[in-house]
């Protein structure tokens, strides 16, 4: 039996740097002493009796964040965080930034409980027992319990009208769906006859699956729990086709289109669409606290301003945001640096979360039998890699700030190996040509392009979305260097 208890850290530092907003770490579950009496933002509501005091809003064992893991100190309450999004649909990024998950990744990419107090996984990896935090509440003060998991499993994803195709695939092992059990009010279990290696990683994903729902709220829109005439009246009032469409519209935990829907996130949406300014306010029942017992997050409000993406660099340079991570790219670096001192902001370079900024994937299942045989020969793929001048790309497109690499796992991963990152990445025209000659592809046409075994010129078509100008520029440079090994790119 493997038991995961909250003991380490989940970080959103790539997104938020030094801003401590209660989403930086997953820690222990013992409430420390020394917390301040109340969050200033809620003092009036508590004084009027419309909101319970802080200690009554927290779970019995909240998630205590270990700031020491990242060298952070206890912060101060107040203020707001302003950023810009290119489209109103991008308010969903609040779920990404908040990173409230049943389990989440720590600094070493290990999974740790967050919303959960503990998690038991058997040695075979096919039985997962989830332990909730007693006293944990939804943002409206209603208890967060096993009923919210049961409702999702029985009344949503296994309801033919709401989910005609059934539960999501990560809740299957092969063709076998999960066996779901409610153990008690604060414990649920998912099991399969075989291991499910995707279950926990899916729960910790950037876009979580939300295998729980606010049952106390959504039942009013479900045919199983609402009088048929009343429910039909609601459907007709909104001009919808069915109760299932109504239920779906009132749910949408990722899209955030319903401001009345209870949440477990650190900030709650308060602005209805359409709008060009979306305001999120702090969740009074959020489950994390700092080392002194102060409820997180520290920041009272999060504001997403919507703007044309082309204007974002100028707005950032004019000091209209507190922090901006989306939409900007390295091509904006020099412009933003010019206004850094005047606008009193810092331009920081962040590591990307992918193994490489861009990657080329030869089609190993190409329908053309001649090309398929060529591409499946590892010597051909190695020659293509050796024919890419990564140093030139770095200098021309990334100001020399990038690192030549293969597309592989990040160095922080326990699966990382230097040879995965460094093999065949040195620009070596001589070695690339030798590999292609060794394959028998030594004949060329009048333009110096190699010929395939059937005599056709070696012309490769690279398909892209065409949405990233940097990718287009990169492909142009690669095309130039591939010409030196007798390969033409379209």
Language-model-detected regions and their locations in the chain:
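N-terminal lobe/hinge region of extracytoplasmic solute-binding protein
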Residues: 47, 52-123
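Surface-exposed binding/hinge segments that line
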Residues: 169-246
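Extracytoplasmic/periplasmic ligand-capture domains
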Residues: 15, 36, 40-44, 105-107, ...
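Bacterial N-terminal signal peptides
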Residues: 17-29
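Edge beta-strand plus adjacent loop/short-helix module at the start
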Residues: 98, 141, 231-260
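N-terminal short leaders/motifs
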Residues: 61-85, 130-143, 216-230
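N-terminal secretory signal peptides that target proteins for export/translocation
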Residues: 1-12
């Amino acid at each position: 039996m493997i038991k995961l208890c909250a003991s380490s850290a989940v970080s959103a530092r790539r997104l938020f740097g030094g801003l401590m907003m209660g989403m930086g770490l997953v820690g222990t579950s013992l409430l420390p002493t020394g917390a301040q009496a109340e969050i200033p933002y809620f003092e009036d509501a508590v004084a009027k009796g419309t909101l319970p005091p802080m200690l009554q809003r927290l779970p019995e064992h909240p998630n205590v964040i270990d700031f020491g893991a990242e060298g952070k100190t206890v912060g101060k309450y107040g203020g707001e965080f302003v950023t810009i999004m290119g489209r109103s649909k991008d308010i969903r990024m609040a779920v990404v930034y908040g990173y409230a998950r049943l389990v989440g990744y720590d600094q070493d990419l290990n999974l740790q409980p967050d919303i959960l107090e503990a998690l038991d996984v058997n040695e075979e990896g096919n039985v997962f027992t989830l332990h909730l935090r007693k006293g944990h509440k939804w943002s409206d003060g209603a208890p967060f319990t096993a009923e919210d998991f049961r409702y999702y499993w029985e009344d949503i994803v296994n309801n033919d009208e709401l989910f005609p195709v059934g539960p999501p695939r990560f809740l299957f092992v092969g063709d076998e769906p999960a066996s779901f059990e409610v153990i008690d009010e604060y414990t649920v279990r998912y099991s399969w006859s075989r291991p499910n290696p995707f279950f926990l990683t899916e729960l910790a994903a950037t876009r979580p699956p939300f295998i729980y729902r606010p049952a106390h709220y959504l039942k009013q829109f479900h045919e199983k729990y609402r009088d048929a005439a009343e429910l039909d009246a609601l459907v007709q009032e909104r001009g919808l086709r069915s109760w299932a469409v109504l239920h779906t519209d009132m749910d949408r935990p990722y899209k955030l289109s319903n401001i009345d829907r209870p949440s477990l996130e650190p900030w709650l949406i308060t602005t209805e669409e359409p709008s060009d300014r979306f305001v999120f306010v702090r969740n009074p029942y959020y489950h994390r606290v700092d080392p002194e017992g102060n409820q997180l997050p520290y920041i009272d409000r999060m504001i997403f301003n919507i703007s044309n993406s082309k204007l974002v660099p100028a707005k950032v340079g004019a000091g209209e945001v507190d922090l901006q991570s989306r939409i900007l790219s390295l091509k904006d670096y020099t412009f933003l640096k010019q206004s850094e001192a005047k606008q009193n902001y810092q331009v920081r370079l962040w590591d990307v979360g992918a193994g490489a900024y861009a990657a080329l994937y030869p089609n190993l299942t190409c329908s053309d039998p001649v090309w398929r045989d060529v591409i499946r020969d590892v010597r051909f793929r190695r020659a293509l890699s050796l024919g890419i001048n990564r140093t030139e790309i770095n200098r021309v497109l990334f100001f020399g700030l990038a690192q030549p690499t293969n597309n592989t796992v990040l160095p922080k991963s326990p699966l990382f190996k230097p040879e995965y990152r460094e093999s065949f990445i040195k620009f070596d025209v001589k070695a690339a040509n030798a590999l292609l000659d060794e394959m028998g592809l030594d004949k060329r046409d009048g333009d110096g392009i190699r010929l395939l075994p059937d005599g056709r010129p070696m012309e490769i078509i690279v398909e892209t979305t065409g949405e990233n100008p940097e990718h287009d520029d990169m492909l142009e440079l690669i095309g130039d260097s591939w010409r030196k090994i007798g390969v033409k790119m379209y």
